[in-house]
A protein has these predicted regions:
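Non-catalytic, conserved peripheral segments adjacent to functional cores
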Residues: 1-108, 124-126, 133-188
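Short beta-strand His + acidic residue motifs that chelate non-heme Fe in jelly-roll/DSBH
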Residues: 110, 118-123
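Conserved small/polar residues in nucleotide/adenosyl-binding loops
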Residues: 188-194
Length: 194
């Protein structure tokens, strides 16, 4: 597995070693040992999968403590633009984001540590999206930001009139209005490799 650092410390792209032959391909999608050595120690406790069509945008979501989550995400079928936004007060990259295209062809994975809002938009006719979380889903701790907050300057690569949102995702606050954010100093130690 190759680790590609991004402009925001702790947010990484993971490129697996792919073995191809005339039968197809094989790759190791996750190794606890290698992830701990190259990224950081994490104990994933829940795997989720979603199916969506072109233009569906899910996000920008996060969970507040004590159920804050790190996520390791990837695409099984299709293509998405995946986005992580730094919402850690006091962070040198507060309000900045990293975006990466995840596809069934590139097999890339995207690691989003705690302290980030996460979302993705579907770029192909259909997508099957999978993600690992290091904490359980807790609806009472849900938080979210507006996907179209101009301060975030996210180019979603899909025209705004083609974006499909859930009812809930249509009414989130902008970052400057957010009533709750993560504290950078309390999270910095868990974003470092062991």
């Amino acid at each position: 597995m190759e680790i590609i650092k991004t402009a925001i410390e702790g947010v990484v792209i993971i490129e697996p070693r792919l073995f191809k032959d005339d039968r197809g391909y094989f790759f190791e999608s996750f190794s606890q040992r290698e992830f701990t050595e190259k990224v950081r120690k994490v104990d994933f406790v829940q795997d989720n999968e979603s199916k969506s069509s072109y233009g569906v945008l899910r996000g920008l979501h996060f969970q507040k403590p004590p159920y804050a989550q790190s996520k390791l995400v990837r695409v099984i079928k299709g293509s998405v633009l995946d986005v992580a936004v730094d919402i850690r007060k006091g962070s040198p990259t507060f309000g900045e984001h990293v975006s990466v295209e995840l596809t069934e062809e590139n097999h890339r994975q995207f690691f989003i540590p705690r302290g980030f809002a996460h979302g993705f938009v579907v770029l192909t006719e259909e997508v099957i999206f999978q993600y690992k979380c290091d904490n359980f889903y807790a609806p009472q701790c849900e938080g979210a930001l507006a996907w179209d907050d101009p301060a975030l300057k996210i180019d979603w690569k899909v025209p705004a009139d083609k974006i499909i949102l859930s009812g809930k995702d249509q009414h989130h606050e902008r970052l400057e209005e957010a009533g709750w954010l993560f504290d950078y100093l309390s999270l910095i130690h868990i974003s470092e490799p062991t």
